[in-house]
């Protein structure tokens, strides 16, 4: 083993889905593909300091300089899932320091930026210690997914696809891929975020995904998402804004209807 102690730091953006994944299988596998724009100014910065541990894996987590044990359950689950990809963790002690440029759990995908930045740190440590030759960003996307599904897309940008679909070659349920073929008009697109409530939302995204598994519109939603991915790809390439706006608005309205239909839940 080399580089048994040190630190690394990464900044990773949140993202906004144009076609959203809603509903998942075991191990964070989506029931439908999704495509997103990254939000470069809504980001998480994570620093991980590591050292050799004689007592097995352990960590401390700090959010904006304060210990946040309320996040430990999600982080514990994340580390259990990724240990097969990052065996060096078995012999490490970590100090994780994270901060956001925007509120967490308020409707912006803070888990996407948080877990993607953490995953980039963790996999960089793995590569330094075990001299892993696997593709860095691909593997980072895989382990990001195991923390938060949408985090897999935050590894890439400005446009990324996650989920197997016939419309994008090499797409996968396990990781996101970058989308490089899009019209230059989208280079100047910006996202305006108005925060009217800093409080944590009533229903978590994770619980919302669980509800989708038994939703009466599940099959229709999955089929429509696949169709919209294909149509949106055409709009992105051609720069057809009328079509682009129609598809994205249709997606927003469809997800809103799903949220307020049976079973009744509010998770936006």
Task: Please provide the spans of the model-predicted regions.
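Surface-exposed loop/turn and secondary-structure junction residues enriched for glycine/proline
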Residues: 19-25, 34, 38-42, 105, ...
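Single conserved hydrophobic/aromatic residue that forms the stacking wall/gate
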Residues: 258-268
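ATP-binding N-lobe of GHMP and related small-molecule kinases
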Residues: 1-106, 120-137
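ATP-dependent small-molecule kinase catalytic core of the GHMP/sugar-kinase superfamily
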Residues: 135-259
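Intrinsic disorder/low-complexity segments
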Residues: 31, 249, 264-266
């Amino acid at each position: 083993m080399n580089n048994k102690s040190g630190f690394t730091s990464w900044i990773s953006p949140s993202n906004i889905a144009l076609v959203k994944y809603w509903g998942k299988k075991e191990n964070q596998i989506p029931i439908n593909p999704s495509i997103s724009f990254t939000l470069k100014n809504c980001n998480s910065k994570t620093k991980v300091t590591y050292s050799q541990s004689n007592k097995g894996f352990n960590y401390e987590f700090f959010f904006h300089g304060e210990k946040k044990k309320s996040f430990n359950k999600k982080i514990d689950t994340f580390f259990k899932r990724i240990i097969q990809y990052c065996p060096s963790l078995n012999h490490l002690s970590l100090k994780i320091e994270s901060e956001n440029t925007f509120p967490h759990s308020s409707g912006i995908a803070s888990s996407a930026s948080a877990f993607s930045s953490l995953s980039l740190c963790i996999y960089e440590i793995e590569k330094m210690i075990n001299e892993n030759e696997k593709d860095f960003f691909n593997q980072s996307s895989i382990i990001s997914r195991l923390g938060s599904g949408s985090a897999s897309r935050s590894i890439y940008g400005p446009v990324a696809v996650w989920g197997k679909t016939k419309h994008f070659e090499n797409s996968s349920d396990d990781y996101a891929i970058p989308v490089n073929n899009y019209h230059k008009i989208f280079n100047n697109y910006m996202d305006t975020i108005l925060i009217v409530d800093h409080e944590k939302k009533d229903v978590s995204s994770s619980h919302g995904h669980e509800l989708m598994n038994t939703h009466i519109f599940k099959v229709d939603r999955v089929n429509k998402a696949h169709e919209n991915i294909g149509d949106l790809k055409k709009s992105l390439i051609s720069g057809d804004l009328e079509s682009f706006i129609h598809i994205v608005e249709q997606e927003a309205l469809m997800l809103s209807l799903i949220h307020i239909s049976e079973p009744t839940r509010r998770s936006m």
